[in-house]
Amino acid sequence: MKTFAGFSFLFLWLQLDCMSRGEDVEQSLFLSVREGDSSVINCTYTDSSSTYLYWYKQEPGAGLQLLTYIFSNMDMKQDQRLTVLLNKKDKHLSLRIADTQTGDSAIYFCAES
């Protein structure tokens, strides 16, 4: 973690992957967030028939960890510090992490199935 002017910064490396049917998903590659602030990771996908949309986290040297998922008939799902927003019309998925912590520094993947 880097410290600058008394602030701690978290680096969320964002990478994307689709876990079935070779569908495409897109998201930004890098996000820097000050510890304690909220962060939003965005993802777009192509398959409007997807039933489930997932967010995974991968810490250095570890395997993928399922953070949360949302059914395609839902608009929002909240679980502790995580909020998932789904706009099925625009094929847009967002993950909001409230009160970011050093343990949130990782690679994040969105996926659809």
Swiss-Prot record:
UniProtKB keywords: Adaptive immunity, Cell membrane, Disulfide bond, Glycoprotein, Immunity, Immunoglobulin domain, Membrane, Receptor, Signal, T cell receptor
Cellular-component GO terms for this entry: T cell receptor complex
UniProt KW Signal keyword: yes
Residues the record marks as carrying a glycan: N42
Disulfide bonds: C43-C110
Stretch forming the signal peptide: 1-22
PANTHER family per record: IG-LIKE DOMAIN-CONTAINING PROTEIN-RELATED, T CELL RECEPTOR ALPHA VARIABLE 1-2
Protein task: V region of the variable domain of T cell receptor (TR) alpha chain that participates in the antigen recognition. Alpha-beta T cell receptors are antigen specific receptors which are essential to the immune response and are present on the cell surface of T lymphocytes. Recognize peptide-major histocompatibility (MH) (pMH) complexes that are displayed by antigen presenting cells (APC), a prerequisite for efficient T cell adaptive immunity against pathogens.
UniProt name for this protein: T cell receptor alpha variable 5
Species whose genome carries this gene: Homo sapiens
The encoding gene: TRAV5
